[in-house]
Amino acid sequence: YKNRIVIPFEGSYAQFEHVIHHELVHAAINELVYGGNAQGLISGRILLQVPLWANEGLAEFLSVDWDTNSDMVMRDLAIEERLPSIPELNYSILAYKGGQSVWQYITQKYGREKVGEIFQQMRRTQNAERGFESALGVDFEKLTDDWHDFLKREYWPDLVNRENFDDFSTKITDRSKTRNFYNVSPSFS
């Protein structure tokens, strides 16, 4: 292990710039939490494991701040009332967009300086959840509730201005009758 980062180039300079920033954030987290030596984590000498959502989410947040793709994902989850708890973000691709959203919330509510404090507290306590609680003064359950409220206040007002699909359209398929989950290449007959 040589404390290196890999930066792939896929042909787009904009994407390349994003990847550089993203990977450098991982290097900074590694330095801050593990003193630049993640070998202790691999060998089992260091017990602290930064949650995937916190690591990937912060890398996304600091490399692109907030973007339309992230906004679209989080808007859909909030409107459909399918927001996961913060610990549940670890188990899906939402570690990136959901984690990015959590960091957006934290920086807006508590300030950007809390980001470094959270990681310092993680290192001090050797526990991610206690690090967040020590820095923010709330546990993950309360942080989850507050984050959900933040997203609902942001996105639910959009629903007021939308028409109900049933008011201007006619349903042409009925899933309860066809027992299918999605329609591919629908055609009128």
Model-derived regions: residue spans:
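Acidic/His/Gly-enriched intrinsically disordered linker/tail segments
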Residues: 1-4, 8-169
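Beta-strand-rich domains and repeat architectures in extracellular enzymes and scaffolds
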Residues: 170-189
